[in-house]
Amino acid sequence: MARQKKYSGKGGARKKNKQKQSVAPRRRVEFRYKGFTLEELQEMPIKKFMEIVPSRQRRTMLRGITPNQRKLVMKIKKARRLTNRGKEPRVIRTHCRDFVITPEMIGLTFGIYNGKEFKDVTLVEETVGRFLGEMAPTRAVVQHGSPGMGATRGSMFVPIK
C-alpha cells in the first residue's frame, strides 16, 4: 500500500521549496523637482525658480523679503562659502518660518524656531519649494498619564494608595 502524504491543513496545497533569488540592491532614483535635477535647480536664476514653484510660494517670493529674511540670506551665503572651503558651517538659527526653501539651501542645517525652542533640521532635496516652518511643527501630540489625586471629580472617591 502506498504511503499517504500528511495533510498540513493549509488549503490542501503543498508548498514547493523555491530557490531564493538574489535581489539586487535598489538604486536610488535621481531626485527631480518639476523635471529639473538638483544641479539644474542650483544653477537656475531665482526668477526662473519662482516660475516652477507652486503659486503660494511664488506669491510669497514676489512680495519681497523682510529685513529678518535678508539677514537669513546673508547667513546662508556665509555658510555656503564655508562649505565650499571644506569647513563645516554652524547651525543657522532663525525665526523666519515663512521663508521658501531654495536649492542653494540644500545640505545646510537650520535651527528653526517653533515657538518654544530651535529644532535642528538638515535640508534635503525633497524639501525644495516648501516653507521652513513646515519642517518644525509648532504643536506636538500630548500624551497624558493617568490623572492624579484631585484632578477630576471622580477621583474624590478613589482610595489613596
UniProtKB/Swiss-Prot annotation:
The keyword Transmembrane helix does not apply. It comes from the Archaea. Keywords: Ribonucleoprotein, Ribosomal protein, RNA-binding, rRNA-binding. The keyword Ribonucleoprotein applies. Residues 1-19 have a biased composition (Basic residues). Residues 1-26 are annotated as: Disordered. One of its GO terms (biological process) is translation. GO terms for molecular function: rRNA binding; structural constituent of ribosome. GO terms for cellular component: cytosolic small ribosomal subunit. Pfam families: Ribosomal_S19. Protein S19 forms a complex with S13 that binds strongly to the 16S ribosomal RNA. Belongs to the universal ribosomal protein uS19 family. This is Small ribosomal subunit protein uS19.
